Design a protein with these regions (language model features):
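A conserved structural motif in NAD(P)-dependent oxidoreductases
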Residues: 71-82
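Alpha-helical segment proximal to the catalytic Tyr-Lys
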Residues: 38-42, 95
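Short C-terminal tail/terminal secondary-structure segment
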Residues: 13, 66, 87, 98-111
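Active-site "substrate specificity/gating" loop of NAD(P)-dependent dehydrogenases
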Residues: 12-19, 24, 41
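Residue(s) in the substrate-gating loop at a strand-loop-helix junction
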Residues: 8
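Active-site helix of classical SDR
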Residues: 25, 33
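Non-catalytic, hydrophobic alpha-helical segments
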Residues: 82-83, 89
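Short, flexible catalytic-loop segment of classical short-chain dehydrogenase/reductase
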Residues: 12, 47, 51-61, 104
Length: 111
């Protein structure tokens, strides 16, 4: 089986719009992902996470446009960018992947 947690870029770096409660919760989920990957391996369950950056959803406000210059791919992500990665982590193509957090940030996490 496979578990994929949804964390955030805000769990790893200061984000101008996230706030402390959100950031702390996502950081904790990152740690939980690693711990569960170790604990669930004996049950043949892989546990991974995805850490999206700016994704175009209803949660995104107009002020987020100011963040685009800090994204090397020069755009916000689309929901499909996240969904495709989650699908991969649930598939047999990632049968030897566990305890990993995949950044879906367009490179924003580099800065």
């Amino acid at each position: 089986g496979a578990i994929v947690n949804i964390t955030s870029i805000a769990g790893h770096m200061i984000h101008p719009f996230a706030g402390s409660a959100y950031s702390i919760s996502k950081s904790a989920l990152s740690a939980l992902t690693r711990e569960l990957a170790n604990e669930m391996a004996a049950l043949d369950v892989r546990v991974n996470a995805v850490a999206p950056g700016e994704i175009e959803t209803d949660m995104v406000q107009p002020e987020y446009e100011a963040l685009i210059p800090r994204i090397p791919l020069n755009r916000m992500g689309a929901p499909g960018d996240v969904a495709g990665t989650v699908y991969y982590l649930c598939s047999d193509d990632s049968a030897y992947v566990t305890g990993t957090e995949v950044w879906i940030t367009g490179g924003q996490h580099l800065f």
